[in-house]
């Protein structure tokens, strides 16, 4: 096993607001714990991944997805001798900013906010951990390490448009402690691609459970067909449930193996010897080989055609959009009925967006009934 510990973010440069160090935990372990104990993290258990949580007890929610992403991230980071605590922290936090009703809710809220700076769930995650969580006397937010903030900012890669960050968060809030021009750390890159691995595979499992497609549909993709062939004769009584679990398990394993191997090749090819080398590279270092990029593209196309374009999903998404839109304009008429004056005084529209984005599916549905 190669040791890339010299490329790890092993030490923190601190936080926006100074704090004494813990006797028992590293700064990144404290970040992880602050996220786990936050109200925003708890609410993820009632937020849609693909299926509204009232549709079944075994479908994934945002919280189960985040835990699965964290598990994959830790595995990769440990193997590469990087900071697994940081990779886990970023993974647990990456979806905090999601609205109720998944991406449909986000689209609706973004449309409502189009003349007021827009809405972006990734940047909303930063708003939550920097301003909206209230647990400390001396500062707003969770006061996470600079490395965690940087990783959350760069979940989708280097920042191209600082104006959006400035509108939704305010560059001054970072007190010149974040380098916006650098690429993300290896830990941030690991978290981002672990997100892809998790939802591509687990959405397949949920899609089959929801009877949107079946095993025969899945094995039309050669990647899954090969895995299926390697197991079909070993499963007693042709138990399809066990077979599907095994296929998904092997799929994740093969993707992780390819990712690790290709990342090592990228580090060698690009002569990455230091953290500065990581920051300077404009393209991701942690990524799949061309073969697995093609497989990932096939899987995404399959999921779009079978799930995203499914009539039931489209109807649910449309219903979720209508609820979010209705809530926005109803609350806007009487904002003081729902929000305190301090939150409303700076930017009432942003305060309403903060409020709605923090709702669970259940809370939004129940509030909509009142209106």
Question: How should each PLM-predicted stretch be described?
Answer:
Residues 92-93, 110, 344:
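Conserved short loop/turn motifs at secondary-structure junctions
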Residues 1-66, 70-76, 84, 118-123, ...:
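Histidine-centered, transition-metal-coordinating active-site segments
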Residues 76-77, 109:
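Broad structural signal for hydrophobic residues in well-ordered alpha-helices, predominantly aliphatic
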Residues 89, 100-117, 208-216:
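Post-HEXXH active-site segment of zinc metalloproteases
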Residues 56-64, 93-100, 113-116:
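Short coil/turn segments at secondary-structure boundaries
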Residues 80, 84-106, 125, 195, ...:
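His-Asp-centered metal-binding catalytic motifs of divalent-metal-dependent phosphohydrolases/nucleases
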Residues 73, 80, 91, 97-100, ...:
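Generic hydrophobic/packing signal
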């Amino acid at each position: 096993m190669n040791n890339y510990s010299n490329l790890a973010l092993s030490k923190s440069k601190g936080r926006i607001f100074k704090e004494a160090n813990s006797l028992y935990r590293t700064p990144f372990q404290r970040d992880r714990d602050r996220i786990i104990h936050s109200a925003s993290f708890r609410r993820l258990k009632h937020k849609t991944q693909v299926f509204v949580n009232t549709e079944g007890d075994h479908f994934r929610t945002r919280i189960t997805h985040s835990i699965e992403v964290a598990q994959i991230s830790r595995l990769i980071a440990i193997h590469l001798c990087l900071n697994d605590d940081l990779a886990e922290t970023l993974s647990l936090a990456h979806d905090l900013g999601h609205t109720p009703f998944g991406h449909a809710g986000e689209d609706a809220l973004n449309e409502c906010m189009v003349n007021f700076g827009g809405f972006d769930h990734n940047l909303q995650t930063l708003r939550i951990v920097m301003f909206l969580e209230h647990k400390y006397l001396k500062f707003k937010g969770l006061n996470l390490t600079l490395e965690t903030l940087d990783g959350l900012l760069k979940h989708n890669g280097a920042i191209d448009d600082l104006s959006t960050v400035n509108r939704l968060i305010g560059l001054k809030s970072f007190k010149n402690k974040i380098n916006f021009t650098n690429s993300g750390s290896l830990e941030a890159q690991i978290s981002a691609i672990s997100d892809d691995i998790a939802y591509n595979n687990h959405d397949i499992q949920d899609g089959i459970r929801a009877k949107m497609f079946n095993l025969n549909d899945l094995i039309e993709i050669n990647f899954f067909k090969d895995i299926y062939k390697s197991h079909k004769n070993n499963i007693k009584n042709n138990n399809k449930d066990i077979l599907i679990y095994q296929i998904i398990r092997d799929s994740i394993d093969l993707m992780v193996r390819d990712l690790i191997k290709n990342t090592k090749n990228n580090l060698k090819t690009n002569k990455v010897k230091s953290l500065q080398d990581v920051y300077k590279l404009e393209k991701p270092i942690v990524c799949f080989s061309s073969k697995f990029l093609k497989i990932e593209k096939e899987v995404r196309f399959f999921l779009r055609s079978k799930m995203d374009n499914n009539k039931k999903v489209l109807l649910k998404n449309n219903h979720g959009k209508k609820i979010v839109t209705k809530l926005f304009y109803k609350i806007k008429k009487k904002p003081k009925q729902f929000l305190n004056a301090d939150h409303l005084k700076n930017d009432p529209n942003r305060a309403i967006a903060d409020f709605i984005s923090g709702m669970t599916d259940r809370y939004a549905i129940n509030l909509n009934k009142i209106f």
